């Protein structure tokens, strides 16, 4: 296995092979990663410039791609856009039984409300999402959005402390510090280099 340090090299290879499926997977992976560590300038153009509507996806793929684009909107501080898009995305997820994507979108929407200072709306959505996630222990979607939801989550936890919420707050704090280190080094985890092999 040869590791390529520059993702653009692999991207050009996919383009030369006319392998659009792999190119879209590659772009969506990098879009989500860079959105999570809040480096929107590095997000691939398909997502950064919000051109998903120009790509033909099979219907089952669409909610996940839209969820990734929501994360990009959050990283670009386009909070009202997240809220507006979620109004149509959540019913679509429910219709197709995409509970995990729906959970992510609920949390992203709560994050957008929190960033706009609408803490009541954020709290309602987070409490609903916590209720859905707790039985299965789905921590990561909350941790990934910790920076946006930490204040609202802390206020929920101060009223009714739960071990599940305590874990989110603890992991979220560590995650936030890790993201800051990554973005300050302008780097990416070695594991993503496997996508370039």
Where are these regions (language model features)?
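Intrinsically disordered and other compositionally biased segments
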Residues: 6, 28, 33-36
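A broadly conserved detector of short glycine/acidic/proline-rich loop/turn motifs that flank catalytic sites
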Residues: 32, 71, 172-175
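C-terminal non-catalytic interaction modules
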Residues: 81-84, 88, 96-197
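Alpha-helical repeat scaffolds
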Residues: 2-13, 39-53, 80-90, 120-129, ...
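Alpha-solenoid helical repeat architecture
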Residues: 1-2, 14-30, 41, 53-68, ...
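Predominantly extracellular beta-rich ligand-binding scaffolds that present long acidic/polar faces
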Residues: 74, 85, 93
């Amino acid at each position: 296995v040869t590791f390529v340090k520059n993702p653009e090299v692999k991207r050009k290879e996919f383009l030369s092979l006319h392998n659009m499926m792999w190119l879209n997977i590659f772009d969506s992976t990098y879009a989500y990663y860079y959105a999570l560590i809040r480096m929107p300038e590095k997000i691939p153009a398909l997502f950064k410039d919000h051109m998903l509507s120009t790509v033909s996806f099979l219907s089952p793929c669409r909610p996940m791609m839209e969820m990734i684009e929501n994360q990009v909107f959050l990283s670009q501080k386009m909070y009202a856009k997240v809220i507006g898009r979620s109004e149509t995305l959540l019913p679509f997820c429910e219709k197709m039984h995409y509970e995990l994507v729906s959970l992510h979108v609920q949390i992203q929407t709560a994050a957008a409300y929190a960033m706009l200072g609408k803490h009541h709306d954020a709290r309602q959505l987070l409490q609903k999402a916590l209720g859905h996630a707790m039985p299965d222990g789905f921590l990561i979607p909350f941790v990934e959005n910790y920076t946006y939801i930490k204040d609202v989550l802390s206020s929920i936890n101060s009223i009714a402390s739960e071990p599940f919420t305590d874990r989110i707050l603890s992991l979220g704090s560590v995650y936030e510090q890790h993201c800051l280190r990554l973005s300050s080094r302008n780097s990416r985890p070695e594991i993503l280099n496997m996508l370039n092999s």
